[in-house]
A protein has these predicted regions:
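Short, conserved active-site loops that position catalytic residues or coordinate cofactors/metal ions
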Residues: 1-2
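His/Asp/Glu-rich metal-coordinating catalytic cores
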Residues: 7-188
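C-terminal functional module detector
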Residues: 168-222
Length: 222
């Protein structure tokens, strides 16, 4: 969820997403996206000429109820629900369906997880509740940091974070998470950096610096 971080006024932002999604679908790759709080609030998203998946399904999952997408050739079931409104206070995951038998079950959810006071109380739930669903992997969105909330013996519960740090407070590598699944539905995942700009902290000794211009000179020499 949250394809865009807030509202966007340049139509090229949305068209860029449409173009890249079309490339995936054109290559036979299924795309499943849930609307997060920013997507739900952004009226422009619903007006985009979005491509359909190879099987004819929409790339956005339903806002009305939890939806399951079955990728039969891959043995994968994807469960998720989009935000209907920006401020979603209900525990959406509580109504997600039981895992599909004999398939690798992925839950996708836009949430801050219960108890998170920094990123907003969106679709609150706990890692224990997600674990009890019996899915094989949880892909979470909303928080811009990569985090793993896996409980011992349970499935990975992973925030991939955002693809690109937006400012100095979002430091370190940013990217996506690639999940590999074997024939027994055991999975392993790794972080794949995709950012093009990083914001490293920089310490400058200003004791002998007399003006702002000198700060810039010292910074550029580092």
């Amino acid at each position: 969820g949250d394809l865009y971080d807030g509202d966007w006024t340049d139509q090229n932002t949305g068209l860029a997403f449409v173009g890249e999604a079309a490339k995936l679908v054109g290559a036979g790759i299924h795309v499943s996206v849930i609307r997060g709080n920013h997507d739900a609030a952004n009226q422009m998203t619903s007006s985009l000429p979005l491509p359909k998946n190879p099987d004819g399904s929409d790339i956005f999952l339903s806002i009305d109820k939890p939806e399951t997408r079955y990728l039969e050739p891959l043995g994968i079931a994807i469960h998720g629900q989009s935000f209907r409104r920006r401020s979603e206070k209900a525990n959406l995951a509580a109504k997600y369906p039981d895992p599909a038998s004999g398939m690798f079950n992925v839950g996708i959810l836009h949430t801050g997880l219960e108890g998170d006071t920094v990123h907003g109380n969106y679709a609150p739930c706990t890692a224990a509740q997600l674990t009890d669903k019996g899915y094989d992997y949880w892909a979470l969105g909303h928080i811009h940091l990569r985090q793993d909330h896996q409980i011992e013996g349970g499935p990975p519960i992973v925030f991939s974070g955002n693809l690109q740090g937006r400012h100095i407070r979002e430091q370190g590598p940013k990217g996506c998470v690639i999940v590999e699944v074997d024939g027994t539905n055991r999975c392993d995942y790794q972080v794949q950096p995709r950012d093009v700009v990083r914001w490293p902290p920089c310490l400058i000794d200003v004791i002998k610096i007399e003006n702002r211009d000198e700060v810039y000179v010292v910074y550029q020499s580092l």
